[in-house]
Amino acid sequence: MSTPLSQPAAASSSATHVTTKIAAKSDNNLVWLDMEMTGLSPENDRIIEVAMVVTDSELNVLAEGPVLVIHQPDEILDGMDAWNKGTHGRSGLIDKVKASTTTEAQAEADLLDFLKKWVPKSKSPMCGNSICQDRRFMARYMPKLEAYFHYRNLDVSTLKELCKRWQPAIAKGFIKRQQHTAYADIVESIEELRYYRQHFIRDVPQTPEAEALASSVAP
């Protein structure tokens, strides 16, 4: 049974993490990440919030990492488009960004410290929804953190797009809450992958033919 996720307090200048299940560091652990940004362009926009959660390979939550709000100057915040100003204003994130003293470098160091407790370097793919976008920002503003992940991504949006095309009725069964905060978006991504695993990716009984084929290609 999956361990439920509970909302950890957002951090502004120092990071803490909440361990929800006693478990060991493992090559098979999955690291989930989400960022909120001022826009879509790493060249012009900046990171304003980042959160991290670790699960095992069965999507059971092992640890909830720091939720970090990153300070950005007013000129960066004033440059946001109407959608971002409205979304991050309603969530209260803009006010938190203005009050925060955490820099991108401090956030990167805190996240790396947390990550190293749960997975070795280059073992976990970066997990999330449309995670390539987060990775672009991370490569620019938190390159040491980006380099700690495996080069592969585990992108739930891939299954979303396949499900919409192959099993549209199943795709309609998962309704996103669209909260647009880093931690809430991670929770939703994990829940979404659990949903696809249960309803879209079916466990098929192993046939003798399949077992023979697997044995023939095994190293």
UniProtKB/Swiss-Prot annotation:
InterPro entries: Exonuclease_RNaseT/DNA_pol3, Oligoribonuclease, RNaseH-like_sf, RNaseH_sf. Its EC number is 3.1.15.-. Residues 30-193 form the Exonuclease domain. SUPFAM superfamilies: Ribonuclease H-like (SSF53098). GO terms for molecular function: 3'-5'-RNA exonuclease activity; nucleic acid binding. One of its GO terms (biological process) is DNA metabolic process. It holds the Pfam family RNase_T. It is found in: Cytoplasm. Keywords: Cytoplasm, Exonuclease, Hydrolase, Nuclease. The keyword Hydrolase applies. GO terms for cellular component: cytoplasm. The keyword Repeat does not apply. 3'-to-5' exoribonuclease specific for small oligoribonucleotides. Belongs to the oligoribonuclease family. This is Oligoribonuclease. It comes from Ralstonia nicotianae (strain ATCC BAA-1114 / GMI1000) (Ralstonia solanacearum).
